[in-house]
Structure formats: structure tokens, C-alpha cells
């Protein structure tokens, strides 16, 4: 029996029907979990991501996958092809190992001139696989909002994407493994050999990634910091304080990648069916929030029933996709008029920015990337799903529905902290104009325009909000 299984199964037997969960708020812990679990793998690694960057953390994890394969682990790597430019040579090398297989979701035929693909095959290539999972030996899995890259793990000099994953053991791991297999064998996925020329006959022990990937000072500093983290010590010696709760996986039908999924099978519909009608409160944290007319109507129906709704999303200054902000900005006044609380994450913070990671709601220079919400302080969703039309209708998504007051209280606590420390609260003045209120200072500071943005950026967003492109956002 693999050592991970021998450590996990006795714990699970003490909590029948429940899953052991550890929320990965801190970016360093999120990287450490993936890196160390890859080192601990003995039989299988099933890895599925929307983005895998060719940067320090991406290369370290590529190296960890190759090292696992050299130990005899079967590695299956499933990537969305929209974000693989520049990775073809690395993927070829990995796929040439007999125990590594790489597959691509909705691959591009034109490798060098990818925009041509959108001209000739738009309806297919506009549908992407946004799922994110990392499953080890069939007994431990990580699911959440993070892709693979320095911006998600606080590993480089880029601004941090503040995010949330959850590490899970228990029955839901088998569900994630089965879901991975559904995607692995679906019609939208192609083996790398069908997309690229992959060399054959390589000796497994001769396949090497560049040594320079591990020899620079920044990489050494980051790995030392990881090794000294309390999380790593708890992970290795099996003393992580797990939250035990009933957990359900929700994942889109892979046929969504072909535009053939039934509407009732789409993740948001199933999500709201499972979570039922809130009676008291919903706290939503979403990097991209484009509610649409139908979504706004649904939110307002809940408000009229006495449900308190609070939403935290990126400000225009913090949003890494400014045009998406247009699909949200057009609905702000209506939501505020009906009593929905809106908070927008600041792009910077007053305190020091020295590698200080505040988890879900960010640190200095952070952009919100988490996708989570809690209902009535009892139920939580953590996953890849953004509250926008693209996640609803075009991209495939996944996530966990968790029945845990402990986890819901954690989300609520972080939300409340962000309201005062990391975000502007939006309010309407007596003339119905939006004000941005900074409550971090001793005295409230009221701003009359989109904070920390230029005139031309505001004009661009205003123009984008007029265009009929909401369904693409």
C-alpha cells in the first residue's frame, strides 16, 4: 500500500461519509502542497490545469512530475491548449517519457499563428477547460482556483493572484479521479502526439529538463522558504488540522467543450439546486463578477426575501482583464439601490509588500483570483467557477460544495477583514452616483471616481459596457 494511502485511510475510517479538508489560503502553502505531494507520489499523478506558466514555479512542478515518472509513477497531464504558447518543446520532452502522457483540451491546429485558429474555428476554440485539480495516488486531491505560475504562488516578482484551494482526502477524491478520466477520454481532448511531433525511443533515464531551471538564487531562496514553512512540517508528519465535512464534487460535463452539454447539467444550475434557497446571508468572493440581467434578477429576488448579499470582486485598478470589468460595472448602481453590498479589492495596500501573504483576499499588489462563496454560515463552494457568462456557458468548471460551519466562518472572517483592510466599499450618494469609500484609515475617505485608474482606462471600460459582448466575458 502506498505510504500516502496508509496514512490517509485510517483517518478516513474514523469519519465515514466525510472528507478531511485543509484550506490552502497562503500561496506558498499552495505551491508546497503540490510540490511535496508530487515528491511523495508512488503510483499515479493526475494533473489538470487551465494555465501552466513557463516560469520558476511552473518549471519546478514540471521537474517534480518528471522526477515522479523516473521513480515509476504514472503521470497524466491534461492542459487547456489556450495557454500553452512557448511550452511545445517542454511538453514534447515530458511526453517522450514512457510513464508520462500529455493531452490537450481543444488544441490549436496553428501552433505559431494561433489567432488564425479563432478565425477558422472560433466556436470550438472559444470553449476552454477552466478546471484545476491535482490528484496523487488516488487518495489526496487539490481543487480550487489556482493555476500553475509564479503569480499564483508568490514565487516571482509579479503581483500576486490572491486565491483559494482546498486539499482533500476521503470519498470525494475518487469522484475527482473519475471526473479526470471523463475529461481524459472526452472528444475535446487530444493526445500530444496528434498535435505535435513527439520523439520516440528516448531512454527514460536520459530525459532531462534544463539544469539552469534550479540553479538560480531566486529558486533556491523560494525552496528554502518552502521547506521552512510550518505547513510542510505538518504535511510530512501527518499533523495537519483537517476539517471533516460532507463534501460533494460538482463538475461540468466535458461535452460542454463541444457545445453539446445539456443546460440542466451545467455547473451553476446544479450548484444552486444543491445549495437551495439561502435564508439569511450570501458572501460571494469572485475575481470576475459579471452577473448579467438574469443573475441580477435572481440576486434581487433573494434580497426581497430578506437575504443579505455581499460581494467582493476586483476593482478596475486590480482587475487583470479590464474589459471584463465593463460587464460588472453596468450593474453596480442597480445592485446598490436594492441593498446588495459591493466591495472592490484595492490594487495596493498601505502596509509593507514584503512577501506578506494574506490568503484569499490578498496582499500588497494583489489581484483577486479566488472563486468562493458561503451561504448562511453553513455551506461553502470552492472551485474554478467565476460568476460570469463564460464560466456559465462556455468554459468547463469544477469545484467542491462543502457543508462546514467551520469553513464558512473562515470565509466570512476573511471577507469581513477585507472590507476594512483591502477593499473599497461602494455606496450611492444622494444624487445616485457611486462613491468608493476607504475605511482602512481612521476617518473614511470618499472617492468620486474609479480609484487608481486613468481617464482613458475609464473611457475604455465605459465603451466596452455598451458593446453586446457580455456573453463572451
Curated annotation (Swiss-Prot):
Phenotypic consequence of gene deletion: Triple deletion of clsA, clsB and clsC results in a complete lack of cardiolipin, regardless of growth phase or growth conditions.
Regulation: Full activity requires coexpression with the neighboring gene ymdB.
Effect of residue 369 to A: Lack of activity
SMART domains to which the protein is assigned, alphabetical: PLDc
CDD domains in the cross-refs: PLDc_ymdC_like_1, PLDc_ymdC_like_2
Alphabetical list of InterPro entries matching this protein: Cardiolipin_synth_ClsC, PLD-like_dom, PLipase_D/transphosphatidylase
EC number, as in UniProt: 2.7.8.-
Transmembrane segments: none
UniProt cross-references to Pfam families, sorted A to Z: PLDc_2
Protein origin, superkingdom: Bacteria
Signal sequence region: none
Gene Ontology MF, one: phosphatidylglycerol-phosphatidylethanolamine phosphatidyltransferase activity
Domain named PLD phosphodiesterase: residues: 125-152, 364-391
Residues annotated as catalytic: 130, 132, 137, 369, 371, 376
Entry coiled-coil feature ranges: none
One Gene Ontology term from the biological process aspect of the record: cardiolipin biosynthetic process
This protein's UniProt keywords: Lipid biosynthesis, Lipid metabolism, Phospholipid biosynthesis, Phospholipid metabolism, Repeat, Transferase
Catalytic activity: a 1,2-diacyl-sn-glycero-3-phospho-(1'-sn-glycerol) + a 1,2-diacyl-sn-glycero-3-phosphoethanolamine = a cardiolipin + ethanolamine
Function of the molecule: Catalyzes the synthesis of cardiolipin (CL) (diphosphatidylglycerol) from phosphatidylglycerol (PG) and phosphatidylethanolamine (PE).
Recorded family membership: Belongs to the phospholipase D family. Cardiolipin synthase subfamily. ClsC sub-subfamily.
Note in the entry: All three cardiolipin synthases (ClsA, ClsB and ClsC) contribute to CL synthesis in stationary phase. Only ClsA contributes to synthesis during logarithmic growth phase.
Name listed for the protein in its UniProt record: Cardiolipin synthase C
Gene expressing this chain: clsC
Amino acid at each position: 500500500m502506498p505510504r500516502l494511502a496508509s496514512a490517509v485511510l485510517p483517518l478516513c475510517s474514523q469519519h465515514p461519509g466525510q472528507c478531511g479538508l485543509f484550506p490552502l489560503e497562503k500561496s506558498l502553502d499552495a505551491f508546497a502542497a503540490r510540490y511535496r505531494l508530487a515528491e511523495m507520489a508512488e503510483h499515479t499523478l493526475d494533473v489538470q490545469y487551465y494555465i501552466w506558466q513557463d516560469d520558476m514555479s511552473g518549471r519546478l512542478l514540471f521537474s517534480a512530475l518528471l522526477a515522479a515518472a523516473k521513480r515509476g509513477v504514472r503521470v497524466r497531464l491534461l492542459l487547456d491548449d489556450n495557454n500553452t504558447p512557448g511550452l511545445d518543446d517542454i511538453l514534447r520532452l515530458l511526453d517522450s517519457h514512457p510513464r508520462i502522457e500529455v493531452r490537450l483540451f481543444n488544441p490549436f491546429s496553428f501552433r505559431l499563428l494561433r489567432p488564425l485558429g479563432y478565425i477558422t474555428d472560433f466556436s470550438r476554440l472559444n470553449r476552454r477547460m477552466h478546471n484545476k485539480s491535482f490528484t496523487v495516488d488516488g487518495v489526496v486531491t487539490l481543487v480550487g482556483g489556482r493555476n500553475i505560475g509564479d503569480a499564483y504562488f508568490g514565487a516571482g516578482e509579479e503581483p500576486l493572484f490572491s486565491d483559494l484551494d482546498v486539499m482533500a482526502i476521503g470519498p470525494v477524491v475518487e469522484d475527482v479521479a473519475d471526473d479526470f478520466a471523463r475529461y481524459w477520454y472526452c472528444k475535446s481532448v487530444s493526445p500530444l502526439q496528434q498535435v505535435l511531433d513527439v520523439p520516440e525511443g528516448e531512454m527514460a533515464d536520459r530525459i532531462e529538463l534544463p539544469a539552469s531551471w534550479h540553479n538560480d538564487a531566486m529558486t533556491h531562496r523560494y525552496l528554502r522558504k518552502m521547506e521552512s514553512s510550518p505547513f510542510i512540517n505538518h504535511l510530512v508528519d501527518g499533523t495537519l488540522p483537517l476539517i471533516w465535512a460532507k463534501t460533494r464534487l460538482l463538475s461540468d460535463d466535458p461535452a460542454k467543450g463541444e457545445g453539446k452539454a445539456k443546460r440542466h447539467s451545467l455547473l451553476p444550475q446544479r450548484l444552486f439546486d444543491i445549495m437551495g434557497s439561502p435564508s439569511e446571508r450570501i458572501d460571494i468572493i469572485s475575481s470576475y463578477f459579471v452577473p448579467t440581467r438574469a443573475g441580477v434578477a435572481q440576486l434581487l429576488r433573494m434580497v426581497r426575501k430578506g437575504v443579505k448579499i455581499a460581494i467582493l470582486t476586483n476593482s478596475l485598478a486590480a482587475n487583470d482583464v479590464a474589459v471584463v470589468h465593463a460587464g460588472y460595472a453596468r450593474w453596480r448602481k442597480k445592485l446598490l439601490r436594492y441593498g446588495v453590498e459591493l466591495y472592490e479589492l484595492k490594487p495596493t495596500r498601505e502596509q509593507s509588500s514584503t512577501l506578506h501573504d494574506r490568503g484569499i483576499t490578498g496582499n500588497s499588489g494583489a489581484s483577486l483570483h479566488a472563486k468562493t462563496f458561503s451561504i448562511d454560515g453553513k455551506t461553502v463552494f470552492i472551485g474554478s467557477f467565476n460568476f460570469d457568462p463564460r464560466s456559465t456557458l462556455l468554459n468547463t468548471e469544477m469545484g467542491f460544495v462543502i457543508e462546514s460551519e467551520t469553513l464558512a466562518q473562515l470565509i466570512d472572517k476573511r471577507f469581513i477583514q477585507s472590507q476594512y483592510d483591502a477593499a473599497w466599499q461602494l455606496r450611492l450618494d444622494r444624487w445616485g452616483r457611486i462613491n468608493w469609500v476607504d475605511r482602512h484609515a481612521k476617518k473614511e475617505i470618499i472617492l468620486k471616481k474609479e480609484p487608481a485608474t486613468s481617464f482613458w482606462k475609464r473611457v475604455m471600460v465605459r465603451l466596452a459596457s455598451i458593446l453586446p459582448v457580455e456573453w463572451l466575458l
